[in-house]
Amino acid sequence: MGKRPLRVFLDSNIILSRLLSDKGAPRIILDLLSIGLPFLIGLTGRYNLVEIERNLKKKMPGILSVYKVYFPKLSLKIIPLPPEEELREYFGKIADKDIPVLVSAIRGKADFLVTGDKQHFEKIKAREEYPLRIVTPSEFIDSILPEIFKELKEK
């Protein structure tokens, strides 16, 4: 993994998926981030937090209290909302609602943007114009687990 910790930006759907299920790749990712591995830093955006809370209040208000207890345990670094002028550069490249997610991940110097949103992120995923890899939760697990085991073995 090298000297610098990997920075992993989580889209809202990854955090929501974990709240709704005890299984799957989102669970593994958030569990890894919550144990405080020194070579893995979790990030999300202020925009994502607003989106999560809005969705929970609207669709699953009973889970909001669980989220408020659970979220601080993740120790994610929160990337502030990007300024409007920074967002403009990305109009037309991705769905408007996802621009703040992509820009927040870039501003947070993420190595990975983990999202379950295949519909909107799939078309930009293969482009090399972004300084990060856009991956699904299982793609992230497949790429990172061997590195984690290697890092832990060396300790």
Whereabouts are the PLM-identified features?
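PIN/NYN-family metal-dependent endoribonuclease catalytic core
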Residues: 9-10, 22, 26-57
